[in-house]
Amino acid sequence: MGFIKQYKTDFDIVDNQIVLSEQYFLRNKALFKKITGTRFGKVLGLSEYESSFKTWANMVKIYEDEFDETLAKAGNIIEPKIRDYVNLKTGFNFHSYDPKKVQFDLFKDDSVFGGIPDGEPLDENGELAYQNDLPMLEIKTTSCDSLIYKKINGNLKMILDENGMPIVKKKDGKKDSWFDSNGKIIISTLYYCQIGLYLYLRNVNKGLFAIAFLKPEDYVLPEQFNASNREIRLIPIKIDHKGFSVLVDKARIWYENYILTGKSPKLTESDIQWLKENGIE
């Protein structure tokens, strides 16, 4: 998709930052997006792939990501199968939500933070079971192999061969990056922040990562994915609410400084290059 609003009309570059036009800001500010778990680490500058500026552009709706159809389809089909697998293995009853039915947000009382966790534990009455000391679920799918991607309009897209299969760059290369030298899985700070925000908003502290390592064919034929035939690691985590509140406060200040004003974070050199790639300079 790329930029969907008009440069020099809806927004402009002023003093090394993008400023929304007064007309666009007043007309659209009520529709600006909240900070979700996915965006949380990005606005804090923790993502190596997306700057806080790009996240800002998405949140004020002048830019839309161009999603990789192969990855999106695989995720939509495979993640429910992983959730079922986790329920079977743990005996928990993790529930997922229809995004449209909850209007893409379970935290409507918070004006800054929102989103939907991958799974929440329910009791036998269908009520949230956090009082039973059960964790929240976060699902991550990752390729075993390092695959070849190409940057198109500032977004990475998986490259397929003539048979429609992902092209392997290095066998087990992606999987190896998840482990330290002692063979222990390392959860990135970005992913920790993602589930951490939802735990914080629910006022609970236990989470459970389900990390599934996919093979190339899983991206092409996700309907045939069988969780029992893939390596899926379950990693429990905890957050410290007092420590995590420092990050929440930083993100809230970021929201107030940039979303509520219609003025972006200052542009970095990589942001300027990204704008040029999208025809804005």
Swiss-Prot record:
InterPro entries, per the entry: PDDEXK-like_dom_sf (IPR011604), Restrct_endonuc-II-like (IPR011335), YqaJ_viral_recombinase (IPR019080)
Coiled-coil portions: none
Signal peptide from the UniProt entry: none
Pfam families xref list: YqaJ
Chain segments annotated as transmembrane: none
This protein's name: Uncharacterized protein MG373
